[in-house]
Amino acid sequence: VHRCLGVLRPLHSLRWGRARYARRVAAVVWVLVLACQAPVLYFVTTSVRGTRITCHDTSARELFSHFVAYSSVMLSLLFAVPFSVILVCYVLMARRLLKPAYGTTGGLPRAKRKSVRTIALVLAVFTLCFLPFHVTRTLYYSFRSLDLSCHTLNAINMAYKITRPL
C-alpha cells in the first residue's frame, strides 16, 4: 500500500513513510494474525481409540464443521482481503506507470518498463505461491464435508499437501 501511494500520490505518501508508523502497523498486523490463528490451538487435537492416539490434521470429527467455518473466515481475512488489496494496488501502479507523461512522445522509458515487469512478476509469484494452496485447501475441506469416494478425497488431499509448501 505504501508503494502504491508512493506511485499514485507521492506527496501524500511522505507522511506515511516514517519508521515509527511502520513499526506500529507491523505490530498491529502481528497481533491480528496471532489472534486470528489462536483458535487453531483449540481445533487441532488428538483423540484416543484404545491404545492408539490420532493427531488430527485439522480437527476432530465432531469439531470439523466449526473448523470449516473458521477456515472460511480466515480465508477471507488472511488471504482474500490482502490478495485483493495487493492486486488492486499493483494494477493501479502499473496503469499509472504505463500512462505517458504529459507532453512526452515516444515509447515508455526503460525504468518504467522495468517497474511494470517487476509488478507483473510480483503478482505472478504471489499468485503462484498462495492461490493453489488456498484453492486446494478450500476444496479439501468442502469435499470432506460431503459424502465423496475415498479416491476423490485422497486425490484432493494429495493436491492440498503438495501445495502446502508453496
Swiss-Prot record:
Name of one Pfam family that matches: 7tm_1
Keyword presence, Signal: no
This protein's record includes keyword Repressor: no
Primary location group: membrane
Keyword annotations: Cell membrane, G-protein coupled receptor, Membrane, Receptor, Transducer, Transmembrane, Transmembrane helix
A Gene Ontology biological process term: blood vessel diameter maintenance
Extracellular side: 46-72, 137-159
Disulfide bonds: none
Ranges in the topological domain labelled Cytoplasmic: 1-24, 94-115
Bilayer topology term: Multi-pass membrane protein
Transmembrane segment boundaries: 25-45, 73-93, 116-136, 160-166
Gene Ontology CC, one term: plasma membrane
GO MF annotations, alphabetized: A1 adenosine receptor binding; G protein-coupled purinergic nucleotide receptor activity; G protein-coupled UTP receptor activity
Signal peptide: none
PROSITE patterns xrefs: G_PROTEIN_RECEP_F1_2
Compartment(s) of residence: Cell membrane
Family of the protein in this entry: Belongs to the G-protein coupled receptor 1 family.
Job of this protein: Receptor for ATP and UTP coupled to G-proteins that activate a phosphatidylinositol-calcium second messenger system.
Record-given protein name: P2Y purinoceptor 2
Species this protein is from: Cricetulus griseus
Taxonomic placement: Eukaryota, Metazoa, Chordata, Craniata, Vertebrata
Gene label: P2RY2
